[in-house]
């Protein structure tokens, strides 16, 4: 199948390649974007980093064709269904169990990179940051595209990784009482129509200010964009030294999110010399996806037991 970069290149350069009047984007950018293919996105029911605006892959698929041992399953390009079950929904995420995906049609959107508006904020604590993101998602003024909230431990790593540490921004944060291992980073973008992108960013800034968010401009988001697909490459190098890095996620309602975050982190940190970075992405008005990234030295058996413990903590806390 076609890879993510090849698909985006074809869509972005559609006027030159296909004679269209407009440029397009698929809007789907998973962390594996550089080496994954469209078929892989569909059969694993993937989510991209811009999903809060464009939707996940199940929101982008129009129709599909699968080859099975008993025949071909082919859905049509209908805009909606009046009856169920929805065959597209059943097949997406089946990972080859129900058949082999051979063809699919995806939605595309007009590509308007000139309208992208970047923003980032530092909050004094996790709860203020959660309150702000929840209000933004329930504000009914439209959704951001990239939208990512890091907890205190991940924020400390981000301060170094994105070149914030030691800058004038860092010094101002310290003067204003934003403390290490308490402050949280929110970064994101708005896009689409120019008026919408500007209005959405303005609304987001107003809400973040209400919850004591310190505006750190689009500089941090640009730094994140520079390495947004690079983390998977680090995994293999770390494993050569016996250091394992993995990610587990769960979808959590706003009401129970603080408890799930607290309980799972307590388990993760119960293992000595283990880093546990947590962030929220793929936001919805009712909930968000909580990601736990753990890094530590462990063998295969220890990893399996540790992973099971994290899953148990997720289930018990939520």
What are these regions (language model features)?
Residues 130-313:
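C-terminal substrate-recognition/cap domain of FAD-linked oxidoreductases
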Residues 314-318:
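Short, intrinsically disordered, charge-balanced linker/junction segments flanking boundaries
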